[in-house]
Amino acid sequence: MSNTLTPLSIQRVKDGFAKQGWEYDDAGEFAIRSGFVGIGLEISHIEPNVNVVSTVAVDSIGADRYEDVRAWVEQYNYTKAYPTVTALKDVDRGITALGAAYTLPGHWGYTDAQFESHILTGIQGVVAASRDFLAEFAPEVTQRLNEVPQEG
């Protein structure tokens, strides 16, 4: 592992995934998609930052729940340092969804250890926020996710 400060890139993310033995799918030149404990996410390099994002939408959380979800995300953002969560209302589909994002600023370099730690923190934060949202608004989905055997 290098102690040299290195700029951010999607290749560094891929290298970290390979080191951990994690699977991912390429999602274009600057992004990958993966999932952890039933939560899908995308990691992208949008110069100069690396972003870990997820959108969680289930049919059981209707558009009529938007105000409830918005109040929940306001409280979540107030009490958590990361990730940032947003209530999303899709009137056409009749659902309210959650957006969760963690951004690793890229205006300076990171050692390999720092980079891996930040990416892991981002993944853990986005997954935890997504599962907290589901536990609050769609506990039946959380229960089903918990019943699915996890690869390991």
Give residue spans per PLM region.
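Generic recognition of long tandem-repeat/solenoid scaffolds
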Residues: E29-G35, V52-V53, L98-A100
